[in-house]
Curated annotation (Swiss-Prot):
Subunit (UniProt): F-type ATPases have 2 components, CF(1) - the catalytic core - and CF(0) - the membrane proton channel. CF(1) has five subunits: alpha(3), beta(3), gamma(1), delta(1), epsilon(1). CF(0) has three main subunits: a, b and c.
Name of the coding gene: atpG
An annotated GO BP: proton motive force-driven plasma membrane ATP synthesis
Bilayer topology term: Peripheral membrane protein
GO cellular component, one term: proton-transporting ATP synthase complex
HAMAP family with a match to the protein in the record: ATP_synth_gamma_bact
Protein name: ATP synthase gamma chain
Keywords carried by this UniProt record: ATP synthesis, Cell membrane, CF(1), Hydrogen ion transport, Ion transport, Membrane, Transport
Length: 280
């Protein structure tokens, strides 16, 4: 009977945990639906910005923001987008693993999300700056603050290169870590769509210098939004799997409990019958 009591306690514990994971799954699903509406608009916005800047860059020969494909890199700033909360499957670990695979000795981290801060601190990797007030309500204004800081770091030559590592959203069950180089822009890697030359007033060089903040802002805003929707999709999947596993475990424990209970009852009946036979 003591073992039966332990099994009953275990069943109740599994049932309670399943209720929690199911609730977390529903919350993640609600957040996923909310932020998914922003993804299409964000993709369209970022695509338009890329297209515009490709046209501008096609007419710029020399700029602090442009480099040849064989440029030398001594120090890179890695912007790493993680979540603030856990329980989201491999969402954070996949991004951090990709960073570690490419990190060089002098490189530093710009951590977005408290999980990125704690991870790279534990690895004793220098964190240049951090932002943790990131959620599904991330706005273009918040992106501008980050963008302005990054732009200043690059113009002041604190880093030769700035890259961002985020989670690319493909669909509700597929998302993968990806890297985008923000600076320098390598002209040979761009795809120019307009065959006809566009005339800029004032010249393209001046327009690039005056509007480069729009370019970097679009990248920051777009990657954070895409990472946010990937985070919620990953958490929903993780909690759904946890709930299903919990229900399966509960079923197995219930069968085990019922078998042991039946065995205990059978044993008690046998003892009663044996006692009655002995008296007769």
């Amino acid at each position: 009977m003591p073992n039966l009591k332990g099994l009953k306690t275990e069943i109740l514990s599994v049932k309670n945990i399943s209720r929690i994971t199911n609730a977390m799954q529903l919350v993640a699903l609600a957040k996923l639906r909310k932020i998914s509406k922003k993804v299409i608009d964000t993709h369209n916005y970022v695509s338009e910005v890329y297209s515009l800047f490709n046209d501008i860059i096609s007419q710029v020969d020399k700029s602090v923001f442009l480099k040849d494909s064989n440029f030398e890199t001594k120090k890179t700033l890695w912007i790493v987008i993680n979540s603030n909360l856990g329980l989201c499957g491999g969402y954070n670990s996949n991004v951090n693993k990709l960073v570690l695979q490419n990190l060089k000795t002098n490189d530093e981290i710009f951590a977005i999300g408290s999980k990125a801060v704690s991870f790279f601190r534990s690895k004793k990797i220098k964190i240049k700056d951090q932002v943790t007030n990131i959620d599904i309500n991330f706005t273009n204004e918040k992106a501008k603050i980050i963008s302005n800081d990054l732009l200043a770091m690059y113009i002041n030559r604190e880093f030769d290169e700035i890259k961002i590592v985020y989670t690319k959203f493909i669909n509700n069950v597929t998302f993968e870590p990806a890297i985008i180089r923000i600076f320098p822009i390598v002209k040979s890697e761009l795809h120019f769509t307009h065959k006809q030359k566009i005339i800029f007033e004032p010249d393209a060089d001046q327009i690039l210098n005056n509007t480069i903040s729009i370019y970097i802002n679009a990248i920051i805003y777009g990657t954070v939004i895409e990472s946010q929707v990937s985070e919620q999709a990953s958490r929903r999947t993780a909690m759904e799997n946890a709930t299903n596993n919990g229900q399966n475990l509960e079923h197995e424990l219930s069968l085990k409990y019922n078998r042991q209970r039946q065995g205990a009852i059978t044993q008690e009946i046998s003892e009663i019958v044996s006692g009655a036979n002995a008296q007769s």
